[in-house]
């Protein structure tokens, strides 16, 4: 355990370890926990005519699945920033999941997925995805929320090349498209995820809320330092 933490603290500053790890854990708890609670409840379908007119393009699952690597890389980059920037970002990140949890429980949504009868790699991948990921917890889209956070968190950071900031924005937009063309989400889900990311990121940056998180995180940081240096 000590060796693992030492390796991690070579990649990340000690103050970035807890916010990053907790972000992942809390995201899983919100997504899985809300499904356990509200899975059997009535779910609203907020599809529009435009959503139904969009084609099903299973090849976009390459983007949909590939975004997990994008998330990992960018969240690590964000956790390597200055202390106050790290806590500002992850305060917004935490707040966004709290709001997602409220929506998932108060106004659970679903959508209509296509009936897949054709064979082929991408169609089989879509069938597998549909079998393991129920059509719930859709509004706002966490896929779109996190992808936009990946861009917001490095936007304007002088330590991150401008070209990569732009690439991150493009990847985030491609993720939005992938959620629609794989019929995992509808347009309202995408818009909700982006708006929520912008709102919570702004709250993290413009208010003093992050100091509460920083105060708590600093205690864990000290424990990490004592453990790895002891």
Language-model segments: which ranges?
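Hydrophobic transmembrane alpha-helices
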Residues: 151-155, 197-205
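Aromatic-anchored segments of alpha-helical transmembrane domains
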Residues: 28-29, 97-103, 170-181
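Membrane-embedded alpha-helical segments of multi-pass membrane proteins
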Residues: 25, 63-70, 142-146, 191-195
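Hydrophobic, membrane-inserted alpha-helices
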Residues: 70-74, 147-152, 170-178
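Alpha-helical transmembrane segments of integral membrane proteins
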Residues: 61-65, 69, 88-92, 140, ...
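Interfacial helix-loop-helix junctions of multi-pass membrane proteins
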Residues: 118, 135-139, 174-202
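Membrane-interface loops
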Residues: 34-49, 79-163, 211-230
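N-terminal transmembrane-helix/juxtamembrane module of multi-pass inner/ER membrane proteins
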Residues: 1-71, 126, 224-230
């Amino acid at each position: 355990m000590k060796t693992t933490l030492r390796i991690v603290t070579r990649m990340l500053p000690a103050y970035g370890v807890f916010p990053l790890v907790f972000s992942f854990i809390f995201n899983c708890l919100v997504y899985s926990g809300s499904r356990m609670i509200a899975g059997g409840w009535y779910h609203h379908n907020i599809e529009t005519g435009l959503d139904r007119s969009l084609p099903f393009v299973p090849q976009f699952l390459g983007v949909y699945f590939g975004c997990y690597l994008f998330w990992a890389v960018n969240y690590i980059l964000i956790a390597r920033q200055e202390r106050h920037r790290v806590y500002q970002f992850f305060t917004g990140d935490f707040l966004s999941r709290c709001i997602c949890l409220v929506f998932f429980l108060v106004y659970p949504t679903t959508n209509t997925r296509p009936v897949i009868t054709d064979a082929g790699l991408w169609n089989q991948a879509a069938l597998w995805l549909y079998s393991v990921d129920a059509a719930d917890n859709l509004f706002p889209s966490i896929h779109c929320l996190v992808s936009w956070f990946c861009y917001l968190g490095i936007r304007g950071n002088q330590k991150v090349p401008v070209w990569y900031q732009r690439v991150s924005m493009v990847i985030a937009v491609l993720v939005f498209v992938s959620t629609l063309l794989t019929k995992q989400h509808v347009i309202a889900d995408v818009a909700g995820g982006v708006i929520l990311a912008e709102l919570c990121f702004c709250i993290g940056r413009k208010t003093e809320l992050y100091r509460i998180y920083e105060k708590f995180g600093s205690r864990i940081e000290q424990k990490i330092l004592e453990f790895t240096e002891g």
